[in-house]
């Protein structure tokens, strides 16, 4: 899976204006000008260095009578794919936006199966940004430091991260863990592009198997959900299967993987035993960390 990490990216989405900023704005439609930030603790979207969006990224914007209008990043800025958003009167308009763009819009189906584990399911949502003909800059940014609202992009999914370490009697010098299977989660659901909300639609748990390909870190994007059974981990190493039962989150909600939170497990393989840390909750948002032990 291609993983992209980032700390925080400020981006300007400039929509071609039909009027100069200093002109009389009552003479006709005025093109909106968008700016946007991704919440600073976000850590999976955008480029591998975690510093910027990638050309070709597409967001959907709704507001001022426009619904699900795609804007694509090209040469460092977001431009309308085929339609420009204009202010057609002097009233203040409110805008929402989401990533990644879905042509059908509305409530879309989501699968978090192993073959879907990429940025295409790392849904982001921003809301409440306003603008008008007199202030055409619509700012999807965090304004709380100035006493305003947080209108920046936030994660809508949850994230489980693993770091695999060699313990007593184990060495990764010649071979690393091949992969792992996680059981106890549901992987089918929906995302609402209008509200940024998710829902689980699967009625039963499905195991997910991830290949490590020589890496000792991995992550799984999941739908936010309550876990009602044990969360079992099997790690394949040197022809053996090491097993552990993971401790479920205690915060912010017990036994629940919460939207916007990342839960990190440190998995240590010892001779015939795995030790798994308490899940540490890290950006995206602060959270839990856990240890557990697993045996052959």
Please annotate each region the language model reported.
Residues 2-296:
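Sec-type signal peptide cleavage vicinity
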């Amino acid at each position: 899976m291609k993983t992209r990490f980032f700390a925080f990216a400020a981006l300007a989405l400039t929509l071609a204006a039909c009027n100069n900023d200093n002109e009389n704005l009552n003479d006709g439609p005025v093109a909106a000008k968008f700016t946007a930030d991704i919440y600073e603790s976000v850590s999976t979207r955008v480029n591998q260095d975690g510093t910027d969006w990638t050309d070709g990224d597409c967001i959907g914007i709704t507001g001022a009578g426009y619904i699900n209008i795609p804007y694509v990043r090209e040469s460092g800025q977001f431009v309308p794919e085929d339609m420009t958003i204009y202010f057609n009167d002097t009233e203040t308009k409110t805008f929402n936006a989401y990533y990644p763009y879905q042509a059908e819009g509305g409530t879309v189906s989501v699968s978090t199966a192993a073959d879907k584990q990429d940025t295409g399911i790392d849904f982001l949502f921003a809301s409440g940004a306003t603008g008008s003909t007199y202030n055409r800059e619509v700012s999807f940014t965090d304004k709380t430091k100035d006493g305003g609202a947080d209108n920046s992009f936030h994660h809508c999914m949850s994230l489980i991260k693993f770091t695999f370490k060699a313990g007593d009697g184990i060495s990764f010098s010649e071979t690393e863990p091949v992969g792992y299977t996680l059981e106890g989660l549901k992987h089918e659901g929906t995302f609402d592009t209008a509200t940024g909300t998710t829902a689980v639609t699967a009625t039963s748990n499905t195991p997910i198997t991830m290949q490590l390909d020589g890496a000792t870190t991995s992550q799984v994007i999941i739908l936010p959900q309550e876990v009602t059974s044990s969360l079992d981990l099997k790690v394949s190493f040197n022809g053996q299967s090491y097993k552990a039962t993971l401790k479920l989150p205690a915060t912010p909600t017990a036994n629940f993987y919460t939207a916007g939170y990342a839960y990190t497990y440190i998995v240590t393989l010892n001779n015939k035993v795995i030790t798994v840390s308490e899940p540490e909750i890290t950006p995206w948002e602060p959270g839990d960390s856990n240890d557990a032990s697993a045996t052959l």
